[in-house]
């Protein structure tokens, strides 16, 4: 499959977010000093990073009900009749006695970037993942959206997941998701040396979670006591999150479940994309699309392999 097949109109829907995501809200909120944004493409470690930052902020919190109460998602719209002004007002009304942490799948300029000294002191924890792995994880995740949620938004299930992985890739996979993954990093890569941007790779988090969680703590400025570190590491482990996966499934966001149980915390692996449908041909097509978007060779290599990006 050639990368040219992802051009709009060839095999599936045009690029763009699903109807339950509104990218405008993050441009309208009143940003504050101390705000933290967890900016990650879909299925690239978003939930893990949200929980990491929350656990660092609290020194270890096993009792929260839904991570989306603790780390609100700047783009999610709970109902087609939701009033965007009201959703923005809710973000602005969040208490001032605790630093806000937000989730976003966006990159600048969709997500406003406040350069150091040029506005509110906002910190951006930016995570990327091997594109093959992210796309492999996306199809089962989309398939796990509840019938009620898809019916509410009038989105046909077969239109987003396809009959098999080849059809999924020929549709929104190559039209929207792969360009989004590479476009996200293309926007953040030039900002990686900014003092308020931390670029982390999912594979590095997996290879050495404790070192990278400490790195995130240093970056965002949360001081964790020696006594609290064991709890932070436990509550951010895959085993703990899998055992408490109901805390990570958007249960408080809408009036009924958005996801089937088990949709968010699935495998947490690296190097296993072939198990979910990434053939050598699809992998080559992903890379071909990627090179047309992410033209910096160093950035392209880092996108796939990880290791520190701050050189």
PLM ranges: what are they?
Residues 2-200, 255, 263-311:
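PAPS-dependent sulfotransferase catalytic domain
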Residues 45-59, 199-224, 232, 240:
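PAPS/PAP-binding and catalytic site of the sulfotransferase fold
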Residues 64-65, 221-231, 241, 296-299:
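Short, surface-exposed acidic
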Residues 132-135, 210-217, 226-230, 283, ...:
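An amphipathic alpha-helix signature
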Residues 233-234, 303:
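Short amphipathic alpha-helical segments embedded in low-complexity Lys/Glu-rich regions
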Residues 234-260:
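Short acidic/His-enriched helical or mixed secondary-structure segments at domain edges of catalytic enzymes
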């Amino acid at each position: 499959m050639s990368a040219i097949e992802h051009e709009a109109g060839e095999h599936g829907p045009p690029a763009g977010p699903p109807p339950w995501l509104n990218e405008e809200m993050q441009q309208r909120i009143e940003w504050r000093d101390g705000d933290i944004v967890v900016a990650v493409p879909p299925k690239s470690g978003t939930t893990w990073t949200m929980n990491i930052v929350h656990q660092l902020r609290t020194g270890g919190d096993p009792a929260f009900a839904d991570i989306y109460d603790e780390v609100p998602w700047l783009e999610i719209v709970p109902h087609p009749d939701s009033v965007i002004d009201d959703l923005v007002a809710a973000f602005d009304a969040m208490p001032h006695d605790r630093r806000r942490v937000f989730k976003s799948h966006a990159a600048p300029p969709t997500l406003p970037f406040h350069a150091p000294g040029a506005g509110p002191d906002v910190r951006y924890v930016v995570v990327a993942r091997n594109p093959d792995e992210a796309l492999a994880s996306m199809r089962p995740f989309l398939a796990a959206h509840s019938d009620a949620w898809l019916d509410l938004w009038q989105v046909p299930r077969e239109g987003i997941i396809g009959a098999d992985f080849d059809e999924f890739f020929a549709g929104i996979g190559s039209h929207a998701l792969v360009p989004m993954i590479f476009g996200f990093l293309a926007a953040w890569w030039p900002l990686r040396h900014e003092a308020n941007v931390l670029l982390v790779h999912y594979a590095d988090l997996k290879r050495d979670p404790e070192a990278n969680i400490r790195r995130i703590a240093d970056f965002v400025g949360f001081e964790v006591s020696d006594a609290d570190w064991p709890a932070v590491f436990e509550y951010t482990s895959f085993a703990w999150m899998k055992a408490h996966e109901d805390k990570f499934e958007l249960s408080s966001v809408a009036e009924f479940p958005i996801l089937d149980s088990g949709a968010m915390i699935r495998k947490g692996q690296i190097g296993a994309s072939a198990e979910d449908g990434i053939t050598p041909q699809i992998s080559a097509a992903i890379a071909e699309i990627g090179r047309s978007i992410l033209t910096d060779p160093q950035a392209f290599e880092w996108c796939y392999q990880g290791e520190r990006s701050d050189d």
